[in-house]
Amino acid sequence: MPQLNPAPWFTILVFSWMIFLAIIPTKVMGHTSPNDSSPLSTEKHKTESWDWPWQ
């Protein structure tokens, strides 16, 4: 039964993972986002503590 012979399928598996792990991430990470987010304000928000009404 030829489908049980791992030799051709293993090489296809290895080469496909080499493509996924080497070529595709470099192409995807090469693009820059047009919307670079920057914080509008760096001041700390004032949070006041308050009591629960049932305590």
Curated annotation (Swiss-Prot):
Q: Record's Pfam families?
A: ATP-synt_8
Q: Tell me the GO BP annotations in alphabetical order.
A: proton motive force-driven ATP synthesis
Extract the ranges annotated as region (Disordered). Answer: 32-55
Matching InterPro entries, A to Z? ATP8_metazoa, ATPase_protein_8
**Where is this chain compositionally biased, Polar residues type?**
32-41
Segments traversing the membrane? 4-24
Instruction: Give the GO molecular function terms.
Output: proton transmembrane transporter activity
Similarity-based family? Belongs to the ATPase protein 8 family.
Self-association state and partner proteins as the record states? Component of the ATP synthase complex composed at least of ATP5F1A/subunit alpha, ATP5F1B/subunit beta, ATP5MC1/subunit c (homooctomer), MT-ATP6/subunit a, MT-ATP8/subunit 8, ATP5ME/subunit e, ATP5MF/subunit f, ATP5MG/subunit g, ATP5MK/subunit k, ATP5MJ/subunit j, ATP5F1C/subunit gamma, ATP5F1D/subunit delta, ATP5F1E/subunit epsilon, ATP5PF/subunit F6, ATP5PB/subunit b, ATP5PD/subunit d, ATP5PO/subunit OSCP.
Q: Return the protein name.
A: ATP synthase F(0) complex subunit 8
Q: Which organism is it from?
A: Formosania lacustris
Phylogenetic lineage: Eukaryota, Metazoa, Chordata, Craniata, Vertebrata
